[in-house]
């Protein structure tokens, strides 16, 4: 029996890339009689139907049958949650659960500091590297030593793309420990129902004779929506640019696009509306510009629906590993709005090119970024430790 402890930042119903990967890993191991799992994370205000979490509470519950210890938080500094109960709960789990394998999702410097206290314990350490700390430069410098100690102690380091290994100043020093496990999409949540199909017909009617470009994500700087809006201003009225999501930049983005009737802001969309837009759009726009975008699940989902993608070159990011230039879509020089607009124009005018890239895009996702493939790689990782 192998006991596995995962340490993500948060856990479902909190929505985020790291949280989804942690859930994917846990789900991939469910049903194995030789494995027992536990998860420790911060608590956060989040809900999904009757499943409600409160930031300040320290509780234990279950997600998909796996025990989750959620530690109440009193504040957040530089995107890092702080908790008074976390050290005690981590100590209890390490001493009582006695994990054979600890999967630590990086970055999480507050927890990394406490985890170091148990480095002499007899567990295998997997550092699951989601992204470099690039935005919070002071935080990155402050925890530089901790990061090196984590990587030195690690038995394996998981990156989500080979691009990130080569582009990270940390991972490139520890290539011999690194393996690649790409993130995955969950196709069960992407299946159209009657409501979706009805919405599809409505959208087709609304946007007939238009080239529909769809983008979806949080409205934050690294997502690059300002560049998509600037590119839209260079396009003719045959285009419509639909942007789903919300965030700190929503108001400023709307202000920037106020004189451009081609741009429509959809706000937060339901899964059903999201699927409908995936199905109806002609081009999937993913204008992220920095390594904070380490992979791009929404990008992979759009490609799964046979949509050619238009991305920017991001050195060291997995975005350009997901979308292959001139094979599954078009890659533009970083921040070059003129090139981005020309890419959209070429795909709009070239139906054969759109279809070629779209078919290749779906094939790439099916061959590389599916849940079963992640499960196999996680199994290889666990069994090899």
Task: Enumerate the language-model features and the residues they cover.
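Short hydrophobic beta-strand element within catalytic cores of glycosyltransferases
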Residues: 305-313
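A short, active-site helix/loop in glycosyltransferases that binds the activated sugar's phosphate group
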Residues: 152-192
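Short alpha-helical donor nucleotide-sugar binding micro-motif in glycosyltransferases
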Residues: 151, 268-269, 276-281, 303
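Conserved donor-binding/catalytic core segment of Leloir-type glycosyltransferases
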Residues: 5, 197, 203-223, 229-233
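N-terminal subdomain of nucleotide-sugar transferases
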Residues: 1-55, 64, 152
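Acidic donor-binding loop of glycosyltransferase active sites
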Residues: 279-294, 307
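Nucleotide-activated donor-binding/catalytic signature segment of Leloir-type glycosyltransferases, i.e.
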Residues: 251-272
């Amino acid at each position: 029996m192998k006991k596995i402890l995962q340490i993500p930042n948060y856990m479902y119903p909190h929505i985020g890339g790291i949280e989804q990967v942690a859930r994917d890993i846990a789900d991939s191991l469910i049903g194995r009689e030789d494995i027992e799992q536990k998860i420790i994370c911060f608590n956060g205000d989040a809900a999904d139907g009757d499943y409600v979490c409160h930031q300040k509470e320290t509780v234990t519950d279950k997600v998909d049958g796996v025990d989750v210890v959620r530690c109440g938080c009193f504040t957040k500094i530089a995107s890092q949650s702080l908790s008074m109960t976390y050290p005690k709960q981590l100590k209890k789990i390490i001493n009582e659960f006695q994990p054979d394998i600890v999967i630590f999702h990086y970055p999480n410097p507050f927890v990394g500091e406490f985890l170091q206290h148990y480095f002499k314990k007899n567990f295998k350490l997997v550092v699951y590297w989601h992204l470099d700390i690039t935005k919070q430069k002071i935080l990155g410098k402050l925890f530089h030593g901790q990061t090196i100690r984590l990587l030195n102690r690690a038995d394996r380091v998981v990156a989500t793309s080979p691009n990130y290994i080569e582009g990270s100043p940390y991972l490139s020093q520890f290539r011999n420990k690194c393996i690649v496990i790409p993130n995955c999409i969950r196709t069960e949540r992407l299946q159209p129902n009657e409501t979706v199909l009805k919405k599809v017909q409505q959208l087709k009617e609304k946007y007939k004779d238009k080239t529909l470009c769809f983008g979806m994500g949080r409205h934050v700087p690294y997502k690059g929506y300002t560049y998509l809006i600037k590119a839209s201003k260079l396009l003719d009225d045959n285009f419509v640019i639909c942007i789903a999501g919300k965030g700190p930049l929503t108001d400023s983005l709307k202000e920037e696009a106020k004189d451009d009737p081609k741009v429509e802001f959809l706000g937060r969309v339901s899964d059903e509306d999201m699927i409908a837009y995936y199905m109806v759009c002609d081009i999937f726009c993913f204008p992220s510009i920095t390594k904070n975008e380490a992979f791009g699940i929404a990008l992979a989902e759009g490609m799964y629906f046979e949509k050619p993608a238009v991305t920017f070159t991001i050195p060291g990011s997995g975005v350009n590993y997901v979308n292959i230039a001139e094979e599954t879509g078009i890659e533009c020089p970083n921040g070059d709005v003129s090139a981005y607009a020309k890419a959209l124009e070429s795909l709009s005018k070239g139906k054969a090119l759109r279809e070629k890239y779209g078919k290749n895009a779906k094939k790439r996702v099916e061959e590389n970024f599916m849940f079963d493939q992640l499960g196999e790689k996680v199994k290889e990782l666990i069994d090899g430790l």
